[in-house]
Protein backbone atom coordinates (compact mmCIF):
# COMPACT_ATOMS: atom_id res chain seq x y z
CA UNK A 1 0.00 0.00 0.00
CA UNK A 2 1.41 3.39 -1.02
CA UNK A 3 0.22 6.10 1.36
CA UNK A 4 0.43 9.85 1.01
CA UNK A 5 0.02 12.01 4.14
CA UNK A 6 -1.05 15.66 3.83
CA UNK A 7 -1.72 18.32 6.47
CA UNK A 8 -5.31 19.56 6.48
CA UNK A 9 -5.75 22.91 4.71
CA UNK A 10 -8.90 24.70 3.54
CA UNK A 11 -8.04 23.40 0.06
CA UNK A 12 -8.36 19.81 1.33
CA UNK A 13 -11.64 20.36 3.19
CA UNK A 14 -13.56 18.50 0.47
CA UNK A 15 -11.33 15.43 0.97
CA UNK A 16 -11.80 15.70 4.75
CA UNK A 17 -15.60 15.74 4.44
CA UNK A 18 -15.56 13.02 1.77
CA UNK A 19 -13.64 10.80 4.20
CA UNK A 20 -15.96 11.42 7.15
CA UNK A 21 -19.13 11.21 5.03
CA UNK A 22 -18.25 8.08 3.05
CA UNK A 23 -15.49 5.96 4.58
CA UNK A 24 -14.67 6.78 8.21
CA UNK A 25 -17.76 5.08 9.61
CA UNK A 26 -18.59 2.60 6.86
CA UNK A 27 -18.79 -0.06 9.59
CA UNK A 28 -21.73 1.79 11.22
CA UNK A 29 -19.49 2.89 14.08
CA UNK A 30 -21.19 4.32 17.18
CA UNK A 31 -18.76 7.28 16.87
CA UNK A 32 -20.70 8.73 13.94
CA UNK A 33 -21.50 11.39 13.07
CA UNK A 34 -18.18 13.02 13.76
CA UNK A 35 -16.04 15.61 12.04
CA UNK A 36 -13.46 15.77 14.85
CA UNK A 37 -14.51 19.33 15.69
CA UNK A 38 -15.47 19.01 19.36
CA UNK A 39 -11.93 19.41 20.79
CA UNK A 40 -11.71 22.81 19.13
CA UNK A 41 -15.10 24.03 20.36
CA UNK A 42 -15.52 26.43 23.24
CA UNK A 43 -17.55 25.09 26.17
CA UNK A 44 -20.24 27.67 25.35
CA UNK A 45 -20.44 26.64 21.70
CA UNK A 46 -20.58 22.98 22.69
CA UNK A 47 -23.38 23.66 25.20
CA UNK A 48 -25.51 25.71 22.80
CA UNK A 49 -24.92 23.99 19.47
CA UNK A 50 -24.49 20.33 20.45
CA UNK A 51 -25.86 19.67 23.91
CA UNK A 52 -28.85 21.89 23.10
CA UNK A 53 -29.81 19.52 20.28
CA UNK A 54 -29.34 16.51 22.55
CA UNK A 55 -31.48 18.06 25.31
CA UNK A 56 -34.22 18.80 22.76
CA UNK A 57 -34.25 15.10 21.81
CA UNK A 58 -34.09 13.15 25.10
CA UNK A 59 -33.38 9.45 24.73
CA UNK A 60 -32.34 9.80 21.08
CA UNK A 61 -28.79 8.97 20.03
CA UNK A 62 -27.08 12.06 18.55
CA UNK A 63 -26.52 10.23 15.23
CA UNK A 64 -30.32 9.83 14.97
CA UNK A 65 -31.05 13.56 15.39
CA UNK A 66 -31.54 14.87 11.83
CA UNK A 67 -29.79 18.23 12.33
CA UNK A 68 -26.90 16.90 14.45
CA UNK A 69 -24.65 15.88 11.54
CA UNK A 70 -25.27 19.08 9.58
CA UNK A 71 -24.51 21.14 12.70
CA UNK A 72 -21.22 19.29 13.26
CA UNK A 73 -20.30 19.70 9.59
CA UNK A 74 -20.97 23.45 9.68
CA UNK A 75 -18.80 23.81 12.79
CA UNK A 76 -15.99 21.78 11.18
CA UNK A 77 -16.17 23.89 8.00
CA UNK A 78 -15.75 27.06 10.08
CA UNK A 79 -12.90 25.55 12.10
CA UNK A 80 -11.00 24.44 8.99
CA UNK A 81 -11.30 27.88 7.41
CA UNK A 82 -10.18 29.56 10.65
CA UNK A 83 -7.27 27.13 11.15
CA UNK A 84 -8.61 25.77 14.46
CA UNK A 85 -9.13 22.22 13.20
CA UNK A 86 -5.67 20.88 12.37
CA UNK A 87 -4.38 17.46 11.53
CA UNK A 88 -3.42 15.13 8.72
CA UNK A 89 -5.23 13.14 6.05
CA UNK A 90 -3.94 9.80 4.76
CA UNK A 91 -4.52 8.97 1.10
CA UNK A 92 -4.27 5.88 -1.05
CA UNK A 93 -4.58 6.40 -4.80
CA UNK A 94 -5.83 9.96 -4.24
CA UNK A 95 -8.67 8.90 -1.91
CA UNK A 96 -8.69 9.99 1.75
CA UNK A 97 -8.69 6.90 3.98
CA UNK A 98 -7.51 8.17 7.37
CA UNK A 99 -7.37 11.16 9.69
CA UNK A 100 -5.33 12.30 12.70
CA UNK A 101 -6.28 15.37 14.76
CA UNK A 102 -2.96 16.92 15.82
CA UNK A 103 -2.49 20.48 17.01
CA UNK A 104 -0.34 22.72 19.19
CA UNK A 105 -1.42 21.90 22.75
CA UNK A 106 -1.72 25.62 23.51
CA UNK A 107 -4.55 25.78 20.98
CA UNK A 108 -6.56 23.45 23.22
CA UNK A 109 -5.89 25.36 26.44
CA UNK A 110 -8.94 27.60 26.02
CA UNK A 111 -10.94 25.51 23.57
CA UNK A 112 -13.26 22.54 24.02
CA UNK A 113 -11.65 19.80 26.09
CA UNK A 114 -8.45 21.78 26.46
CA UNK A 115 -8.63 22.31 30.21
CA UNK A 116 -9.14 18.58 30.72
CA UNK A 117 -6.05 17.90 28.61
CA UNK A 118 -3.95 20.55 30.34
CA UNK A 119 -4.82 19.10 33.76
CA UNK A 120 -3.72 15.60 32.81
CA UNK A 121 -0.10 16.59 32.48
CA UNK A 122 1.48 19.82 33.71
CA UNK A 123 4.06 21.14 31.26
CA UNK A 124 7.13 23.25 31.67
CA UNK A 125 5.98 26.78 30.85
CA UNK A 126 8.35 27.21 27.91
CA UNK A 127 7.72 23.89 26.16
CA UNK A 128 5.94 23.70 22.83
CA UNK A 129 3.82 20.55 22.86
CA UNK A 130 2.17 18.92 19.84
CA UNK A 131 -0.99 17.09 20.97
CA UNK A 132 -2.36 14.08 19.12
CA UNK A 133 -6.03 13.73 20.04
CA UNK A 134 -7.70 11.40 17.60
CA UNK A 135 -7.26 8.90 14.78
CA UNK A 136 -10.00 7.66 12.49
CA UNK A 137 -9.15 5.09 9.84
CA UNK A 138 -11.53 3.69 7.20
CA UNK A 139 -12.56 0.16 8.28
CA UNK A 140 -10.90 -1.57 5.30
CA UNK A 141 -7.57 0.05 6.19
CA UNK A 142 -7.45 -0.53 9.95
CA UNK A 143 -4.52 -2.59 11.17
CA UNK A 144 -2.50 -1.84 8.02
CA UNK A 145 -0.19 0.88 9.32
CA UNK A 146 -2.22 3.97 8.36
CA UNK A 147 -2.33 5.39 11.90
CA UNK A 148 1.40 4.71 12.25
CA UNK A 149 2.11 6.58 9.01
CA UNK A 150 0.00 9.51 10.21
CA UNK A 151 1.81 9.60 13.56
CA UNK A 152 5.22 9.46 11.88
CA UNK A 153 4.25 12.51 9.79
CA UNK A 154 3.03 14.34 12.91
CA UNK A 155 6.37 13.65 14.61
CA UNK A 156 8.45 14.68 11.59
CA UNK A 157 6.53 17.93 11.16
CA UNK A 158 6.65 18.65 14.91
CA UNK A 159 10.43 18.37 14.84
CA UNK A 160 10.71 20.67 11.80
CA UNK A 161 8.40 23.22 13.43
CA UNK A 162 10.38 23.30 16.68
CA UNK A 163 8.07 21.46 19.07
CA UNK A 164 9.74 20.15 22.23
CA UNK A 165 7.49 17.15 22.76
CA UNK A 166 4.55 15.22 21.38
CA UNK A 167 1.71 14.09 23.60
CA UNK A 168 -1.01 11.51 22.99
CA UNK A 169 -4.10 10.54 24.94
CA UNK A 170 -4.91 6.88 24.20
CA UNK A 171 -8.34 5.74 25.27
CA UNK A 172 -8.49 2.84 27.70
CA UNK A 173 -11.56 0.89 26.64
CA UNK A 174 -12.61 -2.53 25.49
CA UNK A 175 -14.81 -1.28 22.65
CA UNK A 176 -15.67 1.85 20.71
CA UNK A 177 -17.82 4.38 22.53
CA UNK A 178 -20.88 6.31 21.54
CA UNK A 179 -20.57 10.07 21.13
CA UNK A 180 -20.20 12.03 24.38
CA UNK A 181 -19.56 8.96 26.56
CA UNK A 182 -16.29 9.35 28.43
CA UNK A 183 -13.79 6.77 29.58
CA UNK A 184 -10.46 6.90 31.36
CA UNK A 185 -7.40 8.17 29.52
CA UNK A 186 -3.69 7.74 29.86
CA UNK A 187 -1.02 10.16 28.72
CA UNK A 188 2.03 9.22 26.72
CA UNK A 189 4.62 11.93 26.19
CA UNK A 190 7.59 11.67 23.87
CA UNK A 191 10.49 14.09 23.50
CA UNK A 192 11.26 15.27 19.97
CA UNK A 193 14.88 14.40 19.06
Where is each model-derived feature located?
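Short, solvent-exposed beta-strand-terminating loops
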Residues: 21-37, 100-111, 157-158
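A short helix-loop-beta-strand connector motif used in the catalytic cores of GNAT acetyltransferases and
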Residues: 47-53, 57-88, 106-111, 131
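Conserved GNAT acetyl-CoA-binding A-motif
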Residues: 129-132, 158-178
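A short, internal acetyl-CoA/4′-phosphopantetheine-binding micro-motif in the GNAT/acyltransferase core
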Residues: 117-120, 135-142, 172
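Conserved acyl-donor/pantetheine-binding loop and adjacent beta-alpha core of acyl/acetyltransferases
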Residues: 75-82, 91, 95-134, 180
Amino acid sequence: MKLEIKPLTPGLAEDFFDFFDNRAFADNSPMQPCFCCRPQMTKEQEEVELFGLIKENPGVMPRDIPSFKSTLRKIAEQQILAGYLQGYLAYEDGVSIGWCNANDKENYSTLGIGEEIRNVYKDSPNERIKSVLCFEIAPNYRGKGVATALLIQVCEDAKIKGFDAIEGYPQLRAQRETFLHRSGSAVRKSRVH
